[in-house]
Amino acid sequence: MNNKIISMFVLWVFFTLWNGVTLQAQAPHPERIYLSGTGIDDTRTWDFFCSAGQNSGKWKKIEVPCNWELQGFGEYTYGRWYTVKGQRPSDETGIYRYKFDVPKSWAGQRVKIFFDGVMTDAEIIINGKPAGELHQGGFYRFSYDITELLNLGKKNQLEVKVAKESANRSINAAERKADWWLFGGIYRPVWLEVLPQIHMKHFVLSADHKGKFQASIDMEGDAKGHEIVVSVRSLKDGKTVYTSNGQTTITHPINNSGKEQMISGEWTNIVPWSTEAPNLYVVKLELKNPEGKIVQTRETRIGFRTVEFFPQDGVYLNGTKLVIKGINRHSFSVDGGRTTNAALSRMDAQLIKEMNMNAVRSHYPPDEHFLDMCDSLGLVYMDELAGWQNSYDSKVGAKLVKEMIERDVNHPCIILWSNGNEGGWNTQTDPLFAQYDRLQKRHMVHPWADFN
């Protein structure tokens, strides 16, 4: 009996310490107000209706996020269905509903809703009205400004209509004729962000191994008269980093109504990020109004590193040749399908490091927390647009390239972009990678091709 108690205590200590390490490795997001859970171990119950297959034809409860097949809805299909004569993929649709509160204190602010991943076509409806155009593509984050659709001080209803098979043939060819299980549903988190009318919408950062720093910030609203204050601190010990002229901040006054603001400077005594020593820093961006009040704060983790490619020679990281020893990885869990969590990402990244490997690719954009783990543990990453031997058409492909890069652009682990997975590239979308990765302009490759 005593041995059993001791064993249980040891397991409890292990998982407590493991979760603590995982939380430290994962980037925090205090700006998010979650409507779903954050992973397979943290879900919320929504109402759900499935059109066909198991448990169809009636309203039931479902946990979000999670692929609906793993909760007993619809039908399973494997991606090589087309190799069996007469077989068709399951194509059920699902309707999700969830009610949430909108306090009166949100008046005068912008409210945006974010979906981190829905398979495959998603129509978003707020209080009976569409939030925007149909989103297509199962591996990408998308969002809508829903300010004008909300009822302040009341319950509001979110409805999501999801089609497992896309109405776009190129998406089905790129994502759903592949050597993996074909799932449906809201499988990554859903959240709200409440923002001031004038705010920093998106930012792109560049930080080299000598401390040179650039930020390109997209503003929403007329920010003339505002200023942006940038500071950097060490993630490890919280110590403030100083600029080359001895200041703790870089202040950028916004003297025009332009949407893009460029900031540059240099930070001193930087310890570079590498695969052997993945040193991370926290960049804080503060937006101040003309009266000097901070109206918005955004933080993200960065690593100061320089990536260079030389023909017939190879990849250099911070001036030292990097011998890449890589592995492929899928985002998958036995309980959630494509729904995972930060602890699983941590475990996979740790196992890859223990195999003496230093690089990863994973067929499609992974969960963001896996990139966080690569940042924290020192794995370089090739971020890849989905497209298993077939490419997206130019219109939808352009949108999905933008969504992938805007989500992932500031991760130091990413050293390469890949336009398509194992042969699924569209050359018309090639220029967009440098357009959205506008500061670092990392190399983009075509898998299986002698390109770039």
Regions found by a protein language model. Give the residues of each.
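Bacterial Sec-dependent N-terminal signal peptides
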Residues: 1-28
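Accessory beta-strand-rich segments of carbohydrate-active enzymes
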Residues: 27-32, 49, 67, 91-202, ...
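Accessory carbohydrate-binding/adhesion or oligomerization-edge regions at the termini
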Residues: 16, 24-80, 161-170, 237
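Substrate-binding/catalytic cleft of secreted carbohydrate-active enzymes
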Residues: 349-352, 359-452
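Conserved, mostly hydrophobic/aromatic
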Residues: 128, 190, 281, 319, ...
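N-terminal carbohydrate-binding accessory modules
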Residues: 32-37, 203-204, 284-352
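Beta-strand-rich binding/interaction modules
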Residues: 126, 212-250
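Short glycine/proline/serine/threonine-rich loop/turn segments at secondary-structure transition edges
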Residues: 106-109, 150-155, 266-280
